[in-house]
Amino acid sequence: MAAWAAVLFAFSACQDVVEVEDLKAKDDIPSNGAPEITKIVLANDKEFEIDGADFEDMVRVEGKNLGNVVSVKFNDVEVDPKEIYARYDMLLAPVPRQLPGEVTDMLYITTKNGSVSKPFTVSIPELKIDGLQNEFTNPGDTTVISGDNFDLYGITVEQADVRIGNAICTVIDATRTDITLQIPANAQPNTDLTIQGGEMAEPVAIPYMNPGFQIFDFNDWPGSGGFTHSSQFPDHTTNFLCDGTEGEGYPEPLNEGMKYLRFHSNVGAWGWMVLWAGYIQVPAEVTADPASYNLCFEVCTNASYPLGSTTRICWGDYMWMPGASGIPVNTYGGWRTMRIGLDEVSENKIIPDGCSPAPDNTAWKIVFTPTDAMTFDLSMCNFRFSKKIG
C-alpha cells in the first residue's frame, strides 16, 4: 500500500490522469511466469504506444507477469521501488531525473520470476547556461548565473568549480536553474568565466566583462549622424546621458566611470518616442554570421516602474517586448544584462538581412512605443554585439 500511495501522490503532483480506482478494483492475477511486455504508453495517454519518454514522465507498461517486481531500470538508472506500482498485467514507473552512466536505450524489468527488456529511449536534457545575470558585476559583488538542469550536471555548491581565469568564485547557492556566486576580488575584466560540474566532461565558458563590439561611444554621444528627442524633455540630462552624479533617482553606473542613458517620463499608447536615431556600423564578423551573435546591453529599472506586458522598445526594426510572457522585467535598481539573438524575429530583426559591414552605415533607432500609456524609468548602457554562449 505504501508503494501505491507513493505512485498516487506522484500522479496528483504532476496532474497525470489515471484510472487508479479501476486498476485497484481489478482482480490481481498471480504472476507465476517470466515477465512479458506487450505495450508501453504514458500513464496519462493510454491510447498511443511510445518508444521513449522524458525525465519524470510516468510510464505505463502493459503485459503479463509484471507483478512481484524486483527492479525497473531506464538505461542503467534504477527506479526507486517506492515509486513503482506493479500487478500481473500492468506496471507504473516514473523515469528518474538522473543522468545515466551508460546509455543503452533500453527498459529493463526484473521480477522474482525472470527479466525482460525492450528498446526504449529516454531523452536526456542538455545543460543550458544563459550567462551571468550581470556580465559586468564588480569584483567582490554577488551575482547569479541562470540556465537549467544544473543539478543533473553536478553544478552544485559541493561540486561546482567556477572561476574567472585562475580566480576561484565562491558558490553561495545552487538550484536546478540558478547559481549564486561571488565574483572574486582579483577577477580581471574581459576574462572567461568557466563552469565545471561534477557530471561534466569539459567546462563551459561564458563572458565576464567582455566589451564585445561596442555600438555606441558614450564619450561622443549621440555621435555623428545621430540625434535624440531630448529637447522635448527639458528636465532630462542632455541627450539622456548620465554618469550617476546627477542626484536622487539616478542609479550608480554599471562600473566606475561608465556613462548610461536614462529615460524617465510618460509615453502615450502607441506613442513613438525616439530616444536615438541615426546610423551604426556593424562589424564584418557580425554581418558574416549574425546567427552567432546577440545584441547585449545592461538595463536598470526603478522598482516602481517595471517593464510590463505593454512595454515595446524598438532596437532598429526589432520590436522588443520584455514583459510579453506576463512576467515583468524589474531589476529593482540594479543592473542586469539583456541578450537578444540577431537571428530572432519580432516584426523584424535587429539588423536587416544582407546588412553591409563597416565602414558602411546601417540605419538604426531606439524607440519607446508601448501599447498602453505608461511611465518609464529605465537606464541602459553598454550596447554591444557579443558572441553567443556555446
Each predicted region: which residue ranges?
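Short, aromatic- and glycine-rich surface loops/edge beta-strands on solvent-exposed regions
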Residues: G101-N113, P189-E199, W364-F368
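Extra-cytoplasmic beta-strand recognition segments
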Residues: F218, I280-L307, I340, F383
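Extracellular beta-strand ligand-recognition surfaces/modules
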Residues: F297, R339-R384
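Beta-strand acidic-aromatic groove motif in beta-rich domains, primarily in extracellular
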Residues: S304-D317
